Amino acid sequence: MKIGPVGKHDARSTTIVNWDEGSHDGFIYQIFLSHGVAGIMSIQFQFVMDGKLVLSDRHGPCSGDMFDVIELNYPHEYITGISGEYYKYEANIPHMRSLKFNTNTSEYGPFGTSGSSNDKFAFKLGKSPQFGGFHGTYDASGLQYIGVYLRPKTVLPKIDTGNAEETESKIVLG
């Protein structure tokens, strides 16, 4: 299930590049972020596929005065949400201004910059490991849009009826 993307881009930009990292099994090992006071410049991922580490392409220019690596505790830690802010007006800057990643055990960020003229977004993916990847766009000025993939559950949780039967057998009438 594709969610988003959110963000905005400068209509004057002629270098918009779409990217999609949704074909992976959802196991992210690391996230690499280049950012600064202008916002999120680029994002890159390292996935676990068939027991091997696979590095995605970098999505956006490798500039910005800060660089962060988010390393998840694979296989026990997984993405449960992403939130942030994007600039809603035309400008020659990265419109994705800040990003924060939530997992089942931790919170990473926010990375980038915050401001009162930014719109906020939040994708909450539930407590289960349902994250399926990222997608978005970038141009020469930085990350413009970002979205996520959600893998809906395919199996109902099992209901433990053993305790219910035990409780019923202990009921005494009259």
Curated annotation (Swiss-Prot):
Q: Which UniProt keywords apply?
A: Cytoplasm, Lectin, Plant defense
Residues in domain Jacalin-type lectin? 1-152
Location(s), subcellular: Cytoplasm
InterPro entries hit by this protein:
Jacalin-like_lectin_dom, Jacalin-like_lectin_dom_plant, Jacalin-like_lectin_dom_sf
Q: One GO BP annotation here?
A: defense response
Q: What is its main location?
A: cytoplasm
Q: Which SMART domains match?
A: Jacalin
Cellular component aspect of the GO annotation: cytoplasm
Q: Name one Pfam family in it.
A: Jacalin
Q: Which CDD domains match?
A: Jacalin
Q: What GO MF annotations does this protein's record show?
A: carbohydrate binding
Record note on quaternary structure: Self-interacts. Interacts with RTM3.
Family statement drawn from the similarity comment of this UniProt entry: Belongs to the jacalin lectin family.
Task of the protein: Unable to mediate restriction of long-distance movement of the pathogenic tobacco etch virus (TEV) without causing a hypersensitive response or inducing systemic acquired resistance.
Quote the protein name from its UniProt record: Inactive protein RESTRICTED TEV MOVEMENT 1
Q: What is the lineage of its organism?
A: Eukaryota, Viridiplantae, Streptophyta, Embryophyta, Tracheophyta
